[in-house]
Amino acid sequence: MSSYIPYVVEKTSRGERSYDIYSRLLKDRIIMLSGEINDDLAASIVAQLLFLEAEDPQKDIYLYINSPGGVVTSGFSIYDTMNYIKADVSTICIGQAASMGAFLLSCGAPGKRFALPNSRIMIHQPLGGARGQATDIEIQAKEILRLKAILNDILAKNTKQKLSKIEKDTDRDFFMSAIEAKEYGLIDKVLEKSFK
């Protein structure tokens, strides 16, 4: 996130209150996932999901995504929490959802996965690098193949595409417009106007 965070002032019968913009959005059950997905960002997103679940498990949560992707295990912590809580999580792509960002976009509640018209969505296989002895590199290669299989299985389920198509399409960077992502099954609708 940017180092500059705007503040908003709300007037109530008890006076004025100042919020940073992200805290104010959280009051409306909006979470911003912006930037590279790493353990720190994932911990913040998970905490916000759990907080909103505790506040009201019957109300939807809106996860806005603008991300180039990031660490698979960090993304899985967000994914698992989205599935663990009772509240539906609606996903909305603003800007781009690439790699793990696209994966999370596809994991929103059925019928509640959206993208703005000029969004860019990209899926591919997980990236990794290994150094060390040959045995260590082999262990890392097996693990990345295991993660790739999990990601592809979940994408196939979310998109209703055949696993073989997902495997082929994720072999290299596969870019889509918002309309193409809808046709592919990654999202349910391209938003022209706010749905709130």
Curated annotation (Swiss-Prot):
InterPro entries: ClpP (IPR001907), ClpP/crotonase-like_dom_sf (IPR029045), ClpP/TepA (IPR023562), ClpP_His_AS (IPR033135), ClpP_Ser_AS (IPR018215). GO terms for cellular component: cytoplasm; endopeptidase Clp complex. The keyword Glycoprotein does not apply. It is found in: Cytoplasm. The active site is at 99 (nucleophile), 124. Gene3D superfamilies: 2-enoyl-CoA Hydratase, Chain A, domain 1. Its main location: cytoplasm. It comes from the Bacteria. It holds the Pfam family CLP_protease. It catalyses: Hydrolysis of proteins to small peptides in the presence of ATP and magnesium. alpha-casein is the usual test substrate. In the absence of ATP, only oligopeptides shorter than five residues are hydrolyzed (such as succinyl-Leu-Tyr-|-NHMec, and Leu-Tyr-Leu-|-Tyr-Trp, in which cleavage of the -Tyr-|-Leu- and -Tyr-|-Trp bonds also occurs). Its EC number is 3.4.21.92. It is an enzyme of class 3 (hydrolase). Keywords: Cytoplasm, Hydrolase, Protease, Serine protease. One of its GO terms (biological process) is protein quality control for misfolded or incompletely synthesized proteins. GO terms for molecular function: ATP-dependent peptidase activity; ATPase binding; serine-type endopeptidase activity. Cleaves peptides in various proteins in a process that requires ATP hydrolysis. Has a chymotrypsin-like activity. Plays a major role in the degradation of misfolded proteins. Fourteen ClpP subunits assemble into 2 heptameric rings which stack back to back to give a disk-like structure with a central cavity, resembling the structure of eukaryotic proteasomes. Belongs to the peptidase S14 family. NCBIfam families: clpP, PRK00277.1, PRK12553.1. This is ATP-dependent Clp protease proteolytic subunit. It comes from Campylobacter lari (strain RM2100 / D67 / ATCC BAA-1060). The gene is clpP.
